[in-house]
């Protein structure tokens, strides 16, 4: 049984992009789906769709590569973990990697990117960073 579906999903995406695979399959959870929605909106992945196989849900993720065949994701890192939670207040959420990166935050208003959380004036648990 996998305890941390977010870490598992990020690791599967990272491994698939290193192997230059077109798609990868993740276990479904609402937080993972919200994280993928942000990654798709920020153009880190092409797309994703939820599929149901039997009584289990999975998410198929289509990865994105540049014209040279390199992954557009340089680094995908889990920040807050089950054993060590990391929280940032609304004043601590700032630009990441000079605006080229994204911080994904779980807030009281849902899972948001650092830009959205800053505009909404909320802080929360830092799930991961992407650039």
UniProtKB/Swiss-Prot annotation:
One of its GO terms (molecular function) is structural constituent of ribosome. One of the primary rRNA binding proteins, it binds directly to 16S rRNA central domain where it helps coordinate assembly of the platform of the 30S subunit. Keywords: Ribonucleoprotein, Ribosomal protein, RNA-binding, rRNA-binding. Belongs to the universal ribosomal protein uS8 family. PROSITE patterns: RIBOSOMAL_S8 (PS00053). This is Small ribosomal subunit protein uS8. GO terms for cellular component: ribonucleoprotein complex; ribosome. One of its GO terms (biological process) is translation. The gene is rpsH. Signal peptide: none annotated. InterPro entries: Ribosomal_uS8, Ribosomal_uS8_CS, Ribosomal_uS8_sf. Part of the 30S ribosomal subunit. Contacts proteins S5 and S12. Pfam families: Ribosomal_S8.
């Amino acid at each position: 049984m996998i305890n941390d579906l977010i870490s598992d999903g990020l690791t599967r995406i990272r491994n698939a992009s290193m192997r230059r695979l077109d798609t990868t399959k993740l276990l479904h959870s609402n937080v993972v789906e919200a994280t993928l929605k942000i990654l798709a909106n920020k153009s880190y992945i092409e797309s994703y769709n939820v599929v149901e196989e039997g009584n289990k849900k999975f998410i198929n993720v289509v990865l994105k590569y540049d014209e040279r065949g390199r992954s557009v994701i340089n680094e995908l890192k889990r920040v807050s973990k089950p054993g060590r939670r990391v929280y940032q207040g609304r004043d601590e959420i700032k630009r990441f990697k000079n605006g080229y990166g994204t911080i994904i935050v779980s807030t009281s208003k849902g899972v948001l990117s650092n830009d959205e959380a800053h505009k909404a004036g909320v802080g929360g648990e830092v799930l991961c960073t992407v650039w």
